[in-house]
Amino acid sequence: MVSKASAMFSRIAPRKARMIADLVRGRDADEAIQLLSFTQKSGAPVLRKIIESAVANAQQAGADIDALFISKATVDKGPNKFNRRWRPRAMGRATRITKGVSHIVIEVDERK
C-alpha cells in the first residue's frame, strides 16, 4: 500500500534537497529517519519530517510500519516569485537575488 506525503514551497534549493533525496531513496523508512537525524546537510530535517509524515499516513491506512521503505522521493523546482531582492551592481544597474523553492514528494510502500 503506497502512502504519500509532500511539502510544497519549501525554502530549500532543489539541488541541495535532491542530494538528500538520493541518500534515502530505496532505504527502509526507519533507517532513513535514523540516517537523516545525523546528517549535517541543510535539507535533512525537512526530509525527515516528510518521511515521518508519510509513515504516519501509512499507519493510519493500516500498513505494517516495520515493512515500509521509501519507494519514491522526488524534488521539483518551485516558482522563484518569492523572496526576490535586488543587489546593486556597477553603473547604476541591479541584479535579482532569487532564493530556491522546492516541491518535495515522498512515497512509502510495504516490502513484499
Curated annotation (Swiss-Prot):
GO terms for molecular function: rRNA binding; structural constituent of ribosome. Disulfide bonds: none annotated. CDD domains: Ribosomal_L22. GO terms for biological process: translation. Keywords: Ribonucleoprotein, Ribosomal protein, RNA-binding, rRNA-binding. GO terms for cellular component: cytosolic large ribosomal subunit. InterPro entries: Ribosomal_uL22 (IPR001063), Ribosomal_uL22_bac/chlpt-type (IPR005727), Ribosomal_uL22_bac/org-type (IPR047867), Ribosomal_uL22_CS (IPR018260), Ribosomal_uL22_sf (IPR036394). Signal peptide: none annotated. It comes from the Bacteria. The keyword Nucleotide-binding does not apply. Gene3D superfamilies: Ribosomal protein L22/L17. Belongs to the universal ribosomal protein uL22 family. Part of the 50S ribosomal subunit. This protein binds specifically to 23S rRNA; its binding is stimulated by other ribosomal proteins, e.g. L4, L17, and L20. It is important during the early stages of 50S assembly. It makes multiple contacts with different domains of the 23S rRNA in the assembled 50S subunit and ribosome. The globular domain of the protein is located near the polypeptide exit tunnel on the outside of the subunit, while an extended beta-hairpin is found that lines the wall of the exit tunnel in the center of the 70S ribosome. This is Large ribosomal subunit protein uL22. It comes from Sorangium cellulosum (strain So ce56). The lineage of its organism: Bacteria, Pseudomonadati, Myxococcota, Polyangia, Polyangiales. The gene is rplV.
